[in-house]
Design a protein with these regions (language model features):
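Long, low-complexity, charge-biased intrinsically disordered regions
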Residues: 1-189
Length: 189
């Protein structure tokens, strides 16, 4: 589906990929400050490239300028896309689908008001919040007691190639600074 050729009520869902709401980020930062939770940030390396197309799905794209565009039979040549790629209208949506399925498989519950927020209460009654963003930086921020952090990071690295960026300092272009028991948010460019 080409983004500019979508039809209302028919194929809008094939390319749309939402992101974490800024109000959710503010709520989670306030919760972390009040409860003394840790906030971590992960960057998924080449996030969209770590996904697969749906079974039976075939996507083709035109050749880049400068390549022979006609085959010997006179028909236009196209490339068949084997995995989602950046710039592909469906890429972010495919990544989102896989990430959500994986997160729910860990036992986290998806929030009703923001698709990018998940929560879980562990066996020892520790509350785990996971907030994700599938923007160009494709990062996830985890807020939980320290012992949950190691387990969650282990599960993440088992499934995805990622970098642990430590304490979250910026998400959705919002600066996040912890000062003792408070967390300050500021708009950063």
């Amino acid at each position: 589906v080409v983004g500019c050729a979508q039809r209302p009520g028919i194929d809008f869902d094939q390319t749309h990929c939402s992101t974490l709401k800024s109000t959710s980020l503010r709520f989670l930062a306030a919760t972390a400050a009040i409860q003394g939770l840790h906030m971590r940030r992960y960057d998924f390396v080449s996030a969209i490239l770590q996904d697969d197309l749906e079974p039976g799905e075939q996507i083709v794209c035109r050749l880049l300028p400068g390549h022979e565009t006609l085959g010997q039979d006179g028909n236009n040549k196209v490339w068949r896309v084997l995995i989602p790629i950046y710039g592909m209208q469906q890429g972010g949506r495919r990544w989102q689908r896989s990430l959500f399925l994986w997160t729910r498989s860990l036992g986290l519950t998806q929030c009703d008001t923001d698709n990018y927020v998940f929560s879980m209460t562990t066996a020892d009654d520790a509350l785990v919040w996971v907030a994700m963003s599938t923007t160009s930086s494709s990062s996830t921020s985890k807020m939980a007691p320290t012992h949950c952090y190691a387990s969650f990071t282990r599960e993440l690295t088992r499934r995805w190639e990622l970098e642990d960026e430590g304490e979250v300092a910026n998400l959705l272009n919002i600066g996040i600074a912890r000062q003792g028991t408070s967390i300050k948010l500021n708009q950063s460019a």
